[in-house]
Every structure is written in C-alpha cells, then in structure tokens.
Amino acid sequence: QGCTVSTILFNAAFNTVFEHLSVIEDDCAYQFRNQKPGKPILQVFVTGYADDLGIVTGRHGENGAFHNNEKALKRLQEWLAWTRSMKAKPKKCIASGLLNGKPVDPELKVWESQGTWYPKFLEDEVFKFLGKGLVADASSTQSKEMILATFEKYAKLIDGTFLTGVEKMWIWEHFAMTKMSWSFLIHDFPPSFVEKELQPIETRYLKKWSGLAKRADPSVLYRSKKNAGMGLKEATVEHKRQRLIRRHQLATSKDPRVRAIHDQFAELQLGRHKQGTNEWKECMEMEKLRAEVKTGKIVGAPSEGAGIGFRGRRRCRPKALDKHKAEREEMLRVFSEIIEQERLVKIMSKPLVASDAHPFEKEGNYFCGWLKWEAAQAVDLSWGRVLQKQDAFLKFVLNSTQDSLPTPSRLKNWAQARASDGKCPLGCGQPGTLMHILCGCVKAHQETPQNRIKWRHDSILLAIYRAVQSRIDESKEVEKDAVPQASQFRSSLGKQFTVPHPEKDCSDRLTPLRGVFEKADDWKVQFDVGVEGELVAERPFPSEIAIVSGRGSRPDGVMWSMKTKTVIWIELTSPWEENMKSQHFAKCEKYNQLATDLRGGKHFGVKWTVLPHYVEIGARGAIQELGWVRMCTQLGITGAARRKLTHSVQDAAIYCSHYIFLCRFHRQWEPQRLIDTWRKDA
C-alpha cells in the first residue's frame, strides 16, 4: 500500500485470472453474428480493468448463455480461492440476460450473502462499470437522461453564482465542457440527441452570459477567432470529435480483437451508407478524414497563385514515437476546418427577412457582413483579454460584429414596437443602421465644436501618438547604450591598434535593433492631439519641411529628422470595416502628390526620404492588417509593444463606438475628453 510498484505488482498478479478463464473461452464466449467464413471467429468473453471484471457469454450447443455465465463465474471463484487473499464482493456483483432482445433474470447462483444469491439481477437499477452506466436492456436511455440532467445541472450551477458573465463562460468552457467530453467519449447516444437536447441549453446560457441578442446568430460564440468568433466548444461538434477519437483509438488498438470488432462495426456502417440512411456514421467520417490527411501529406502545401496574406494548411508531421497519435491530431485538425467551413456556408446561406429599413441590406445576408472584412485583424477575444474587461465590452463587440444591436433599422426588421420608422434618430432622414450611426451620419459629422465621429478618430490617434513618443524615447536610450564601433589596443612596444567591430557580432551580447528612429537624435513629432489627450487645433504641415496647403497636405501625425532628412507621416481612418480597403487606397491617392514632391526636392530644393503610413482601425475594432503591420515594423514597434498598441487602439475604437451607440438618440453632442487607452505599465 502506498508504494508506486504496488499497482504494477497487483496488475501482474490479477492478470492471471484471464489465463485461468481462457480455458473455457471457446465453450462459453459470446460470438458475434454474421461471421465471415475463412476468418477467425469473432467473440468476446472477459473484459476488465484493474480489479473490475465483466463476463459476456452466449449459447454453445445445448448449453445456454446463462448456464455458461454461471460456469465462468464458478471458475472465477476457484481462482479467488486459489489466491487466498482475494474474494468477490457479492453486493457489487450484478447480472442481466437478454432473451429475444428483452432483459430477463439469468438466476445465477454463485455467491450467497444474507439469504440472497449473487450476481443479482439488475432490474431497473443502474450499475456503473468503468465510468459507464449500465442498465438491464443495455440501451442508452439511462445515459441520455443522466447526461441531460448533468448538462442542465452544470448550467444552472454556474448561472446561479455571483460571477460576471465572462467568468461564467470561462468556467463553462474549461470545466463543464471538459467534464462532459468524457461522457461523450464513452456513451453511445446519437448526435441527434445532442443537437436537439443539449445544444439548445448551451446556446441559451452562453447567449445570456455574453449578452448576445436573442435573434443573433450564435455561431459567433463557436467560430474560430480568425473568423471573428470566440472559439468556444460547441456541444454537437465536441460530441462528434470525441466519437472520432474513440473510433480512431479502437481502429489503431494494439489488441487484435478490438481491431476486429471495429472492422466489423465499420462494415456494418458501410452497408447502411450504401443503403442511403441519413444518420451520422463515425466510421465513414473517420475514413474520409484519414484520406484527407494522407492526401495532404502527398500534395504538401501548395503556394502557386497564393496572394499576400495567404496561409496554407499546416501539414501533418507525425511524431516518431507515436504515429497513431500524430495521425489522430491531424485528423481532428482537418475535422475542425471542415466544421468551420460548414459554419461559414450556413451563415452565408441565411436569407434576410423583412429587411425594408435600408435597400442595401437586401443585397447581402444579415449576419455575415464581417465576411467582407478583407485582410482585417478582428478584435482579440482571447480569455486573457476578455476576463480583464466588463461584460458590456464583450456584449458590444459580439453584437456589433453580428450587427445585432438594437438600432432603429434593426428593430424595424424585428418588428419591434419601439422601432418607430427605423430612421436615424439625429434627424438626417437616412435609415438608422449601425453603420450609419457609427460612421455615416451627416448630422454627426457637422457637430461643433466636437463631433462624435472625430472624437473616436482622435482617441485612437492618441494611442498611436503615445506609442510613437514612447518608441522615440526608447531609441534615445538605446543610442546611449549602443555598442562602440571599434576597440583600441596598445601593444607591448607602445604601438596603438584600432580594431573595428564586425557588423554581425558573434558574441553572446544582444545588440539593440537599429530602426528608423535610431538613425538620428533630433526627431520631432507633430500630432493632432495633445500630450494630455486634449484636442488640438488643426496644425499645418511643418514649415521647415514644406509649406503646403489644400487637399493632401495635413496628415494626422508627422515625425521628421532634419539630420537624416527623413519624414514619416501617419494618416488614420476609422471607417466601417467593410469600407477599409477603399478608404486605404483613397488615402494613398490623397497624399501621393505630397510624397512625390518631397522625394523630388520640390520644396526648398531638399530631397527627403518619405515613409508614409495609412492605417485603418475599424469602428468595431478590426484592423486593416497590411498597413498596420507595415507601420509597426518600420517604426520598430514589435513584439510585446505591438500587441500593447494593437490592444490600445482596438480598445479606444470599441469604447468610443459603444458610447456613440449609447448616445444615438442624443441630438446634442457634449464635447468629451479623448479616451486614453495607452498605459505605460501595460
């Protein structure tokens, strides 16, 4: 007891029972139907794990299954007596027989305790064997009831706590679904049960905890993060996933009997597939996935014709120690990709209903506008982020992405009484869609002294300004600590030598990364926001570079160095995400002439090195990735600093848009201080 070797010794000793019972296996074991001639007889007799045993018997000649079972149990008792240290626990021994598919009492008499013979007939009781609940008729009825009750119990238990909605979702994802995955693995109920009974429970509570609108498409909860979702485990998908894991484990088992049983079950499902039955067949699904994995290994990762930003599938690289596990992981990855594609197809196939508020909405599908975000980086909804936010943050992000916020236009689509005419509340006469409220209202753009749309733009710009200023300050510190360019030595004869350092230092010392800001120490910065986040009057282009006016002469932020004759500018746009691509090219065209003139020396005869950057941060927090990555890389904002800046600008966009949405009925906009989401200690 307590020794780590004790379990090994026990298993080694207990395994002798299988040898003792194997003598009568051919006379007592249960043989499967439809045996194929010329192949070994497929039968099962004893199953066991640790000190738990199960004995399955069938008819052989004149001896019935019940007689053979009692014979096997009595031989087991002989082995127990031989060990002199083991004995059966009669009260934990149960039995059940099937006669023409109906449960009957086999009336086995092997052990007696207090006038009762054991194994006892199971009747209406449930016996747990190796984690699975067994009933007399060997059906899955009881397991369905147990799973359903447990599912509801977990949901109500979590819902009854005083935690935030995000925290409840985290517990559901990492505790409840993890616990349920084991039940999905060992029980045999069909996917239709999960879809009809369990999935509605999960979706209902997740919608409640996340604040997702009742009519919103719940796929945002289960879609992968690259498709603007949260990536939560979906009960229907998790059930199929566990069934595939179990089936693959059986198909690749080291036990030839287990593999033989799997093969016969697979043949049965193949026959039903040829008959055209509609149920989900795990064996057929597994073989398709394995074929996909095998094809992927042969084809490799095709790159011909791939555009910028294309990323091919990761191909299988099996581990040398366990090729079956590597294949299973790759198979499940392909399965996840297929499920994700099916979700997208379902979303794009969903028709619009009663969309009379805005003609544009008739052209597309209601819930899939985010699919038009070309090369966009969606809001980071990782647990590390959302657990630090209030529930209102997640609620706004999910509903704004799905366009399921209660705007006047959407309420009219939903036939809500409070929708009125579905027009813009500010009185411009246009349909009150979310895009119009956050980006397009003429009345909002004409507000003075501050308009709500520019307030969001300037709040995002403030985060970029602080990051740039921090980067310049950092470059000055790096310049102080820079490695000397050469070392001087004096020989024993008094002669001096100067040895230049190689460009690539082979020492262990890490040399600082020299970016554009490290090439000079006289950088000046001019942004349309103040140091304290206050609004700044529109400033003209720096006069020591050029004196210009008119269209395309005033970027949002300018950085320049007179020593290196380098000028960098940043032009920020905060549009509706579907318009980010067109806005990007419009900004490029707007400032192209200024960049051309500066490079050509048309201002004061000085040729400048011009590094223009045009970035788009969507009204709902998505980022036009190409321009954003280019800006951060060229300015030397990498690694943790880039993640910090990305989170800061996304937070600024979401916070401001959320407040703009809350003020959608306020015709008079009160000037607001810029929201500062940049934190030095972040």
What residues fall within each predicted segment?
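Catalytic palm active-site di-aspartate
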Residues: 1-7, 27-63, 80, 84-98, ...
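Short Cys/His-based metal-binding microdomains
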Residues: 234, 414-471
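Basic, alpha-helical interaction scaffolds
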Residues: 115-189, 244-262
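Short, conserved micro-motifs composed of acidic
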Residues: 74, 86-125
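Active-site metal-binding core of divalent-cation-utilizing nuclease and nuclease-like domains
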Residues: 37, 414-416, 476-569, 585
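Extended C-terminal regions of large enzymes
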Residues: 197-198, 211-420, 652-656
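Catalytic cores of nucleic-acid endonucleases
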Residues: 529-532, 538-556, 560-561, 565-567, ...
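Conserved pre-motif C helix in the palm subdomain of viral-like polymerases
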Residues: 1-30, 68, 167, 176, ...
